[in-house]
Amino acid sequence: MAGHSKWANIQHRKGRVDAQRGKMWSKLSKAIIVSAKMGGGDPSLNIRLRKAIDDAKAVSMPKDNIERAIKRGTGELDGDAVEEVLYEGYGPGGVAVMCLALTDNRNRTAPELRTMFGKFGGELGKTGCVSYLFERKGIFVFGEGADEEKVTELALENGADDVEVDEDGKVQVTCSPEAFSDLEVAFDEAGMDTEVSEVTQIASTNVDLDESVSGKVLALLEALDDHDDIQTVSTNANFPSESVSE
């Protein structure tokens, strides 16, 4: 899981800067729309929607924007349909990359991602080209200084598969997608804040990168992460510590 943990840490630091610029509003609006469409417009009954709303509030997204997104998801307001699409490809050095997009226009998103992959030395592939290298997992990352014993106890009581502490002292919990909601509720009720909380694609095995390639891979991943339609980016790349600390 080390490769995912390092990339997740980079995303978390970068996300704080993005939030200050308001760049997350478009992404979060789509997340709210899809969450409301899948589970209804009541956040007290729809944990995924509640998390999307909390994320939106954390970056000062206006209340009216949030309410409009919910109503688009429930069908109370008209708008282009937003759907989840999983894109797969290869980065520099042949590393595997998977991107979860929320898009209202596949004919726009796919060409843009194809161009982006090519610009950074990669290639957008066909469905199934790298997905066999990943498993769909829930993941929670707690910052340095988190109570490892308390995290572990709650995690194991609520269906987690594994608890690890990475080299930066961060506690990482992984679980099946089915156990994600129970764990999310347990951590929330215990007042335990997470740096990362999502269901994503986790590589079964990681590919170690040297410095000559890691910078190119990071440039691609960060560009993909910046795209308005992309919600999560996963890779099987394992970055040198020097790359993560930059």
UniProtKB/Swiss-Prot annotation:
Could you list this entry's UniProt keywords, alphabetically sorted: Cytoplasm, DNA-binding, Transcription, Transcription regulation
Cite the InterPro entries for this sequence: Integrase-like_N, TACO1_YebC-like_2nd/3rd_dom, TACO1_YebC_N, Transcrip_reg_TACO1-like, Transcrip_reg_TACO1-like_dom3, YebC-like
Where in or outside the cell it occurs: the entry states:
Cytoplasm
Query: One short Pfam family name for this protein?
Result: TACO1_YebC_N
List the molecular function annotations (GO) for this entry.
DNA binding
Main localisation, per the record? cytoplasm
A Gene Ontology BP annotation from the UniProt entry:
regulation of DNA-templated transcription
A cellular-component GO term for this protein: cytosol
Instruction: Give the similarity note.
Output: Belongs to the TACO1 family.
Q: State what protein this is by name.
A: Probable transcriptional regulatory protein RB5500
